[in-house]
Design a protein with these regions (language model features):
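NAD(P)H-binding glycine-rich loop region in Rossmannoid oxidoreductase-like domains
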Residues: 1-26
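Structural signature of the Rossmann-like NAD(P)-dependent dehydrogenase/reductase core
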Residues: 7, 48-53, 102-108, 132, ...
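Conserved Rossmann-fold NAD(P)-dependent oxidoreductase catalytic core, especially the SDR/UDP-sugar
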Residues: 7, 11, 32-79
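Conserved catalytic-core motifs of eukaryotic protein kinase domains, centered on the activation segment
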Residues: 15-22, 60-64, 114-115
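Short alpha-helix in the Rossmann-fold core of NAD(P)-dependent oxidoreductases
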Residues: 24-31, 35-38, 50, 85-86, ...
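Conserved beta-loop-beta element that borders a ligand/cofactor-binding pocket
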Residues: 53, 89-113
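Substrate-positioning beta->alpha
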Residues: 84, 125-152
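Mid/C-terminal beta-alpha module of Rossmann-like enzyme folds, strongest
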Residues: 142-208
Length: 209
């Protein structure tokens, strides 16, 4: 047996947009397999499970509902197979019978190779939309601290069996226009208005907040 299961993997966009059926199989299938494995352990009631969900589950979040709350209804954007798979996977954990679970709905992950991700998804953001990014380092720290703080007894029973939105904090809340400026500036390029036609960017049906 084990004490903790941290399920942080999954098939995400843009690969999820190109291969929707594989995305469903991967994300939902993984959740089902993990739940079965946990429940099959002799100490199943003692195992604590953390599942990383996504704010994409609450769909399009343009102004004035651009900042999300944990209690917001699930409303997946049109054609967002990734978010659909995450909703079903999340439900799989919640309804599995696992005694202690927690769902962390993560925002966009900021990682060093994001500049190499040359895909049409770069235009699938409202230029005046906002996002609170979460760095890959903070994601790792969260998982580490979850285990360490629980072992110290700092996470009470009221922490488990709940949903939480997670991000890297106030300093990582930025408009998509500002984010484009930072990315392009890193490459020594002019601002987005100099390189892109505003009509290339969508106006709605984005899944960030």
């Amino acid at each position: 047996g084990c004490d903790y299961v941290l399920h942080v993997g999954g098939m995400v966009s843009p690969a999820a947009d190109w291969k929707p059926y594989r995305t469903q199989k991967t994300n939902i299938g993984a959740a089902e397999n993990i739940c079965k494995a946990v429940l099959a352990q002799p100490n199943a009631d003692d195992i604590k499970v953390c599942y990383i969900g996504t704010v994409a589950e609450t769909g399009d979040r343009n102004y004035p509902i651009h900042w999300g709350r944990c209690g917001d209804p699930l409303k997946v954007s049109i054609y967002d197979h990734y978010a659909v798979s995450k909703c079903v996977a999340e439900r799989t954990f919640v309804e599995s019978g696992i005694k202690n679970w927690v769902v962390m709905r993560q925002s966009g992950i900021l990682y060093p190779n994001i500049l190499k991700n040359m895909d049409p998804i770069m235009f699938h953001v409202p230029i005046n939309g906002v996002l609170e990014w979460c760095t890959v380092e903070d994601s790792g720290r969260l998982m580490c601290n979850l285990v360490l703080e629980d072992e110290k007894g700092n996470l009470g029973s009221d922490f488990w069996n709940h949903f939480y939105n997670i991000g890297s904090g106030k300093e990582y809340r930025i408009s998509n226009y500002e984010f484009e400026q930072l990315l392009l500036g890193t490459l020594g390029l002019a601002g987005p208005e100099k390189l892109f036609d505003a009509n290339w960017f969508i106006l709605k049906n984005f899944h960030g907040q």
